[in-house]
Amino acid sequence: MSPSPRPSDADGYRSLPALPPVTVFLTVRDEERHLTAAVEQVLAQDYAGELEVVVAVGPSRDRTREIADELAARDARVRVVDNPTGRTPAGLNIAIRAARHDVLVRVDGHSEIDASYVAAAVETLLATGAANVGGLMVPVGTTPFEEAVARAMSSSIGIGSASFHTGGAAGPAPTVYLGVFRRDALERVDGYDEHFVRAQDWELNHRLREAGEVVWFDPRLAVTYRPRGDVRALARQFFRSGQWRRQVMRHHPETAGLRYLTPPAAVVGIVGGAALAVVGATAGPTWLVAAAAVPAAYVVGVVAASAVVGRDLRPAARVRLPLVVATMHVAWGSGFLRGVARKVGRSARDLPRQGHTAVLYPDPATSSPDARPAPGEGRDHRLPAED
């Protein structure tokens, strides 16, 4: 797939030859509520080329497997493969190996994409010659708390200035949401590193760029994301994201940057200031005020920034925004400081891939409910969970 001349912003993306066949791939576990909608929106894509869907299914406690098999039985474009470990990066690699085509489109089991998503992404991939093209994660909430999370996740005060969160002009980017890949580029870097239970997208895009490839952000490629619905779930998500972002930094020290070190530094300042305030309470008001300065400044800053960013939210969401922002910061920073107990040694791409043989369903000769992994079987419980 050779690069085409890059179009100007004024002209837009030029007309291209017949679109190539694509494989849309996803990995799921315990997704019975959303899987049918996720697959059907892919099958309904307004795409002129050939399209198939590969679903890697992990050990589930619900009807995810049965629903996937029913979808495959109804439409020959859908194939189901087994992901014995249930881990996201392993499932993605299994789906990629099972794919028949050279353009690979990743979606999530609970994401929502527009009918033109695949066509627009493939056109951009061809026009730019990039290894990976992705767009904007658009969080959409329905409750006041979810609306506050959505606003925090799409603003720089909540999650930083990454273009796939906050938007921006089309162009090269460090990473993008999900992704539409050239298969040859993925194979050259050996796909997803299966050590990284989370942050595997960022880590993969880093290796692509290190290999001289281009990761391209296109704001037209919007993907709807449903945010966490309560403080506990949000804190758990961001704590684990912080853990795994530190793991990426340990494995790739060159990726260290101020953006990733600010939240843990803030946590240290808040906790240290609070501890000194307790001690200072016995030493007199001067020590107490000095020790409380950092935590107080942080609280004032979060409240002030939230008032600006959330000024057009409905009141119930607006009053929750400072709590949401603080939860994101403190949980992510704490996770980063905690890290992952198990150190990454060799990359998974250097290790033999055990238990990753693609098993296609339905297959009357080999498939039976008894032969499939039980829920949780094959998972490495020494690593933090993904959610």
How should each PLM-predicted stretch be described?
Residues 115-147, 151, 222, 226:
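Conserved donor NDP-sugar-binding/catalytic core segment of glycosyltransferases
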Residues 82-99, 120, 176:
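Glycine-rich, basic loop-to-helix element that forms the pyrophosphate-binding segment
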Residues 193-256:
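Catalytic donor/gating beta->alpha subdomain of glycosyltransferases that bind UDP-sugars
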Residues 104:
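Short aromatic/hydrophobic "clamp" motif used to bind/position activated sugar donors
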